Design a protein with these regions (language model features):
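Strongly charged
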Residues: 1-131
């Protein structure tokens, strides 16, 4: 008997990630659209990293308009971490633009959990999800 979560995860739409853009590629992209050089932009990004670390180590969140908020966290072992909360405007722009990447199981976008489980049960009759 398959679990409901296994079936849903098997068929859920997933982005097939391309190569991650690094600082150099970001700097080249931004420099082509501004009067700054790639070196200037990398310097600013390095300074931004230092500034976020500084304020987070002081227990302060950092809000970067258009990107999101970086909030320091701590767990029971005393390990520090940073949570990123995506800016609402950026999320809205992502969802209102046309996505050019590849999506695995794209045909399942908009299907209900019941429809996905029915699909699983039809394709896996020997390992059904039971309600």
């Amino acid at each position: 008997m398959a679990s409901r979560i296994s079936a849903l995860n098997h068929y859920r739409p997933q982005i097939e990630y391309g190569e991650t853009a690094d600082w150099r590629e970001m700097a080249d992209y931004m420099a082509a659209r501004s009067t700054l050089s790639p070196s200037d932009i990398i310097g600013v990004l390095t300074g931004l990293e230092d500034a976020v670390l500084h304020f987070n180590l002081s227990g302060r969140g950092v809000k970067l308009e258009g990107l999101g908020t970086y909030l320091p966290n701590i767990n029971y072992r005393g390990e520090l971490d940073v949570a990123h909360r995506l800016d609402r405007r950026l999320k809205r722009q992502l969802n209102n633009s046309s996505f050019n990447g590849r999506i695995r199981n794209k045909k399942n976008i908009g299907k209900s959990a019941a429809e996905v489980i029915a699909l699983w049960n039809a394709e896996h009759p020997d390992d059904p999800v039971l309600y």
